Amino acid sequence: YSQVKKEKEQGCYEDFIECLKLYDKEENGTMMLAELQHALLALGESLDDEQVETLFADCMDPEDDEGFIPYSQFIQRLMSDPVVFD
């Protein structure tokens, strides 16, 4: 029961992806780093610049040649190994 309750409070992968799709201008599963940062801060908890940098360093794939990042892998990494801030 406690695991289900915890998962419900955290949201699920599909919920996060659906929210990010609202910000995905190209509708191709990628976003520019600044767009992803804006979306995460608009939808989630308030993080300072250092926390955002840590989060991206731990969970982010490199940008492609055009500066886009696939957000599904980012969410998968974030959910499988959450970043803990002190």
UniProtKB/Swiss-Prot annotation:
Q: Which UniProt keywords apply?
A: Motor protein, Muscle protein, Myosin, Repeat
One matching Pfam family is EF-hand_7
TM segment ranges: none
What is a single cellular component term in the Gene Ontology annotation? muscle myosin complex
In what residue span(s) does the EF-hand domain sit? Answer: 11-46
UniProt key word Lipid metabolism: no
One annotated GO molecular function is:
calcium ion binding
Q: Which cysteines are joined by disulfide bonds?
A: none
Q: Matching PANTHER family, A to Z?
A: MYOSIN LIGHT CHAIN 1, 3 (PTHR23048), MYOSIN LIGHT CHAIN ALKALI (PTHR23048:SF33)
- Subunit description: Myosin is a hexamer of 2 heavy chains and 4 light chains.
Name-wise, this protein is Myosin light chain alkali
Give the originating organism: Drosophila subobscura (Fruit fly)
Higher taxonomy: Eukaryota, Metazoa, Ecdysozoa, Arthropoda, Hexapoda
